[in-house]
Amino acid sequence: TVWCPEVTSVGVIGSFNDWTPVYLTPQGSTGVYSGVIPEAKPGDLYKYRITTAAGETFDKADPYAFWAEVRPGTASRIAQLDGYSWHDGRYQAVRRSTKSPRPMNIYEVHLGSWKQQEQPEDPDYPFLSYRQLAEELVPYAAEMGYTHLELLPVMEHPFDGSWGYQVTGFFAPTSRYGAPHDFMYFVDQAHQHGLGVILDWVPGHFCRDAHGLGRFNGKMLFEGADHPEWGTYKFDFARSEVRGFLISSALYWLSCFHADGIRVDGVTSMLYLNFGLPDWAEKTYNAQGSEENTAAVEFLRQLNDAVHAYAPGAITVAEESSAWPHVTGDTASGGLGFDYKWDMGWMNDTLEYCKTDFPFRSYHHNQLTFSMAYGFSERFILPLSHDEVVHGKLSLMGRMPGDYWRKFAGLRLLAMYQLTHPGGKLSFMSTEYGPFIEWREYESLEWFLLDYPAHRMHRDYVQHLNRLYRDTPALWQDDHSWEGFHWLDADDSAQSILLFRRTGREKTKAVTVLLNFQPNVYSDFRIGVPYPGQYRELFNSDAGPFGGSGKENPGILKAEPIPCHGEKWSVCVRVPPIGGI
């Protein structure tokens, strides 16, 4: 069955009929064509042969195919979806029933380059399979203390260099890594290891390859316009059939593959009619004379309502970089209905600050504090994503000023700042061991760097920090309100120090965080505390086993009746260089 209105005929050609058309029957005036081909079986290749009213004939892959031929082949492949035995019932039940806050520390992964075969039989296919990744990536991420995996698009795509963001198969896990059952096994194993799986999903545009959705019936059908920035087609959100196609795709991944959420790519490009159009003469406007794409807005609300209705416990995340209001607001109140939004402002400000050399940081202190001026206007995730380590932007390590030691110290401090700042967390693969080069999608990560002590110690540091975050409710229970965050000193620009308190539901188990962005050491730094008694240092980024200089605070810190930071009591600590406690 396929939707292909305003054509003369639709036939099915495939390996089961020697690529000779078997014509489908039109279903009234719906534009839908259907038929049954008894000899077709799982694994067979097929396409649609479409003839337009103008007499043009061409072949297309099935928009609704569950599997595809391995690239560079472009045919669809018949898949067997039933028959997989799931073992994630307990995880699924907890996800559906849990309403209380949970930690969110996401490991973002490109499956094709996380790790590759050392000696592949075919150099064009060096990838690990879904099942191999289930045995290697999944336990690694769980052992590292992450709570979720987020996968760059696994939907079928023809070009490796698109990283999966130019899709042809919105219902097909890419055949580069195996069959649909293999991907089910990957998700199943993730759940059995306690990891959620979030899928990057691209409803804003699709690639122009001839076998894909573009000009599917000889003219614009799924698309409404060209995408000027990305060389792709934009979906026509005004068509109910297109909205239904996309929402069905999202629900399919959540139901059939047990995914725990979708991260909607390029939301900003969907919300604005003229996104990426520099020429005023080419711009278009809606009926109210503004640039908002009202059809896309309605689609996003329908999408989020559908996900929350049909996939209880699943989340939706928006990559949205403008100031569009209420992205995570309820649809009934005029919001878009997402559960989370990437905080692109935090990411940009933080990375700009981190690459600033130490003598000049005091003049840019606001880049560290501005995020809290709007920090609870949405439910945010703090992303250090793949987009920040490509196209000449440098790796995170490459941004850090100073010598080798200071670079690692800066990277440790960045990780602590991210994990103690309100909001969910997302880090791209490899940042846990500190590579110096940017990410390259065509080759494996540089795992050999773990043979070097500095990189190995950094990986161990991230593991311990992740576990501290996961096991400390004060760092995530009240992540989206002022109840969980209190500035002790936001204005110490002279010393480039941030001082704040994180609080969960047990107020007496609050955590005080000090972050020093300068290479200076302070031996007697006083911090205000809310209660008398004894305090201890939970974690120190400067600890020797992590590659630090060992400026720690061992033993008991006894509160003294000396007022400080608006509190009646205070403790005196040693502050490490380019470090946090």
Q: Which residue stretches match the model-derived regions?
A:
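Soluble or luminal CAZymes and related metallo-dependent hydrolases
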Residues: 129-133, 179-182, 241-246, 291-299, ...
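Short, contiguous acidic/charged loop-to-helix segments that flank catalytic cores in large enzymes
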Residues: 170, 174-178, 237, 288-292, ...
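Conserved alpha/beta catalytic core and glycan-binding cleft of carbohydrate-active enzymes
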Residues: 258-260, 275-442, 470-527, 531-542, ...
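Carbohydrate-interacting/catalytic domains
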Residues: 1-105, 130-141, 145, 406-408, ...
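Substrate-binding/active-site clefts of carbohydrate-active enzymes
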Residues: 91-101, 110-291, 557, 573
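Short, flexible loop/turn elements at secondary-structure junctions
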Residues: 6, 28, 39, 110-115, ...
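Generic recognition of well-ordered alpha-helical segments
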Residues: 135, 185-188, 248, 302, ...
